[in-house]
Amino acid sequence: MANLEIIDQKGKSAGNVDLNEEIFGIEPNESVVFDAIIRQRAGKRQGTSAVKNRSAVRGGGKKPWRQKGTGRARQGSIRAPQWRGGGTVFGPTPRSYKMDMPRKARRLAMKSVLSQKVADNDLIILDQLTLEAPKTKELKAILDNANVSGKVLVVSDDKNVQLSGKNLPKVKVVPVNGLNVVDAVDYQKLVLTQDAIKRIEEVLA
């Protein structure tokens, strides 16, 4: 079972915590993580691109010229695909890009990412993370005290913390139920509180 140090908001040691080995100590499955990332990004696609085919383009009801006798190639409509202003063949139509993925696989992907963070020493655990008011400077001080730099993903349900993180470049704050594979992979450091760990273990156990 992984045992990590807990630090307080001033950067001082506040004890240790035992992490669930089945969540924070498994062998990462890169293939499942890749599938989860593709699925999440695909689900965000708007899927509204569309073009008109020959039946949707206005006009073209009359035959341009008679079938025979002109010496030109026969034509039935000025909105056929070969005409300028004609309809498009096999163009995009509105569709959903959402992909299905078994719940077990989605959970395995999240476990793999969390386990990789532990293996790379990129998981920082705070005893708590609360602010009395939205103060960017205070949140930055807490991260500096924890010796956290680079791209940081902070998991917190505190509204003041969420507001404080909006003005910090390379810092993103998400609620516990908003923790996802794409953000966890995109941001190098992951900051969790003890309460967040308990809730994550309840969901993924």
From Swiss-Prot:
A GO CC term assigned to this protein in UniProt: ribosome
GO molecular function: rRNA binding; structural constituent of ribosome
Region described as Disordered: 45-97
Keyword terms, alphabetized: Ribonucleoprotein, Ribosomal protein, RNA-binding, rRNA-binding
Pfam families per UniProt: Ribosomal_L4 (PF00573)
Biased composition (Basic residues): 60-71
Single GO BP term: translation
UniProt subunit comment: Part of the 50S ribosomal subunit.
Family of this protein: Belongs to the universal ribosomal protein uL4 family.
Biological role: One of the primary rRNA binding proteins, this protein initially binds near the 5'-end of the 23S rRNA. It is important during the early stages of 50S assembly. It makes multiple contacts with different domains of the 23S rRNA in the assembled 50S subunit and ribosome. Forms part of the polypeptide exit tunnel.
NCBIfam families documented for this protein: rplD_bact
Protein name listed in UniProt: Large ribosomal subunit protein uL4
Gene symbol of the encoding locus: rplD
